Amino acid sequence: MERYKLRQVIGEGASSTVYSGVSARGEEVAVKVVPRKGRSTGMVYREIEMLSTIKHENIVGIVGRFESKKHVYMVEELCDFNLVSFLNEYEVDEDVALKILRMILCGLRHIHSLGIIHRDLKLGNILLKGNTVKICDFGLSCYVEENNSEFCGTMDYLAPEVVDGKKYSFGVDMWSAGVVFYVLLTKKKFCESLDSLECSEELRDLLEKLLERDESKRADASEALMHRSFSRFIPRCEDFRGLPGFERGTKYGVLRKAGDSVELGSIRIDARRGKRHGGGRKHGDLGCLCGEEFTYSVYVDSEEIEPAFITNGQLKTLGLLTAHVKAMREKTPKIIIDDDGNKFYYMFSGGFVYVGKELTLRARGGKYEMSRRSGEKTYLEAVPDFLYEAIGGLEARCKAIDKEVCWFSRESPVLIDCSSHQQFSMSCISQVSEMSIRNRVEYDYIESTGWCIRDGLNFLFLMNDGEMFEVLCPDLAVRYRGRLLFIDDRLPMKLKRSLKGISPFLRSLCDGCYMS
């Protein structure tokens, strides 16, 4: 023991004593001291062997071992306290209890994948180091193929099959995890019933799956981690495929987007080919994003993993990565319209920035920030009345283009830069954006009126005054402001005026004399 100096006792068990200690290099550790007598020696050797094969953030790490004639010393990472002390010192709400349970389940999933049954999971054998849960004390643990279903563990945490002397497997750890979760929620001993438990239906459902008396029906660690209760902790990634590439260093590693992937440190997200809305493509190009639902795969150290199984430490990195993607979508313009010096930036997120001669208006999370040239800022619940018509028209134009156009460029944002309504042209889009448009669609500019997007016998009109409507010739109908109106209905006066304005254009199509 020349390398370590023992300090105070921090834990005692039936066959061992745990001390805090410090190495010659100043590293703080925990030292488990086990006398060489009875079964204790074999158990500690077994524990050292198991912990040496387990490398996981939710399992206490082994640093080394030493021996003397009378004792075996197992050196482990030092933690702050166990869950018994934690419960005595802090109030635990549902969110905190769920976070603790999730880390316990991550640890159990890992050891179960190695064929190890813990067999003595309880509050005293679950440690906290900072905000991270660590399962410890593998003295009663065994490999599943060597399991003889002996009676062992701590009475209050024993699964029914252990108490009844039946054969058992990994499910005993799941039952114990359920008991730990129950105690975290109630600070009471589990009494075989959930009738008096006051909690959300979601948590009750999770507990019922963990405390299922029939081991064959009891949730395993993977199934429990997939429970909807934990979805609140898993960050979702927004569609990054059209964003420009980026690369920068952070304290968590290199943050990078290249092609259909984003990554940070050991975490990578790959976009994958998903289903298309309506079941079909707008054209035959397999690289097109139009109508394709955004789905993705998550990788840790180049191995694909279900996001529900990602550890708490990895979730922090994943959260930073998805937050950066979201921020990039909010500040990267997809379409820019220059309207007589007033610029409208339509972002990948669906938000916008309107930069006028006297003010700037930003849409942020359903609210608006208006900044005047004087430096005065105002926060609003809605677009100001004096900008409502202009902003509404510009936003409608961008949404219509975003919906109808097939975007191919995924290495840089797709931008449209037009100096006025009259110069707002699809040739401008294709030149600036380097995109292609599906062959069966044609775009026509109607002098002093607006744009028409022709899709077969359907016509989408983007008017210069901001109005948008679709004429469905086969149905003799008009889609206007979310309603389907038939030509012989009583149409709104403004729509009637718009239809009257486009009638010469429609007649010219019928006569075959219109040149696009």
Curated annotation (Swiss-Prot):
Its EC number is 2.7.11.1. Signal peptide: none annotated. It comes from the Eukaryota. GO terms for molecular function: ATP binding; protein serine kinase activity; protein serine/threonine kinase activity. Residues 4-230 form the Protein kinase domain. InterPro entries: Kinase-like_dom_sf (IPR011009), Prot_kinase_dom (IPR000719), Protein_kinase_ATP_BS (IPR017441), Ser/Thr_kinase_AS (IPR008271). It holds the Pfam family Pkinase. GO terms for cellular component: nucleus. The keyword Electron transport does not apply. PROSITE patterns: PROTEIN_KINASE_ATP (PS00107), PROTEIN_KINASE_DOM (PS50011), PROTEIN_KINASE_ST (PS00108). ATP binds at I10, G11, E12, G13, A14, S15, S16, T17, V18, K32. It catalyses: L-seryl-[protein] + ATP = O-phospho-L-seryl-[protein] + ADP + H(+); L-threonyl-[protein] + ATP = O-phospho-L-threonyl-[protein] + ADP + H(+). Keywords: ATP-binding, Kinase, Nucleotide-binding, Serine/threonine-protein kinase, Transferase. The active site is at D120. Belongs to the protein kinase superfamily. CAMK Ser/Thr protein kinase family. This is Probable serine/threonine-protein kinase ECU02_0550. It comes from Encephalitozoon cuniculi (strain GB-M1).
